[in-house]
Amino acid sequence: MRGSDPDAAVFYLAKMLDAGEDVKFIARRIMICASEDVGNADPQALIVAVSAAQAVERIGMPESQIILAHAAIYVACAPKSNSVVEAIYAANRAVESSNGSVPVHLRDATTSRIAASADAHGYDGRPGDPDASIRGTQYKYAHNYPEHYVRQQYLPDDIKDAAFYLPGENGREKEIAAWLRHLKERDL
C-alpha cells in the first residue's frame, strides 16, 4: 500500500488470507498505513480503513476479503504523505527538551489565581466570547475573528516559533498548506 501499487496490495492481501492471517490483524495494518503513510494527503483513507475494520468484525469470512481488498486498494491508490508522522515525532522531541508550559492566557481558569487575574485585568477579546470570564486577559476567542482565526501564542515561550506539522504537496495536504500560508500572510 505504501508504494502506491494496488495490484501488489491486493495480491499480498490474498497471500496473507491464504496463509491464514487473522483478518483483524490485516485490518489493523490497513488502518495504520492509512494514517502513517497517507495521513492528511487523503483523510478519507483512515475513515475507509476504520469502516473496513468494523465491517470485518461483523461480517467474517469469506466476505471480509472483499472488504479488506476495498480498503487496501483505496489506501494503495491514495496520495501519500508522512507529514503527520513527522509532526508527532518532532513534537515528542520538543516535549522532551522543552521546559515550557501552556501560556497563562490559554489555561483553564479553574484556579482562583487565573480567575482573579481575569477579573482584575478585564478581558481584551471581543464581545460575545463565552470564555471571556474564565480566561486570562490575553486570550482571544478565534471564532470572533474573520475566518475564525486570530494570531496569538499557543506554544510555550521556549518553543513559541516551532513548526511541527509541515504539510506536503500531495492530495489534500496541498490545500492545507495553502490555507496555513494564507493565515500566516494575514499576520504580516
What do the predicted segments below correspond to?
Residues 2-147, 155-188:
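Terminal-proximal interaction/regulatory segments of ATP-powered molecular machines
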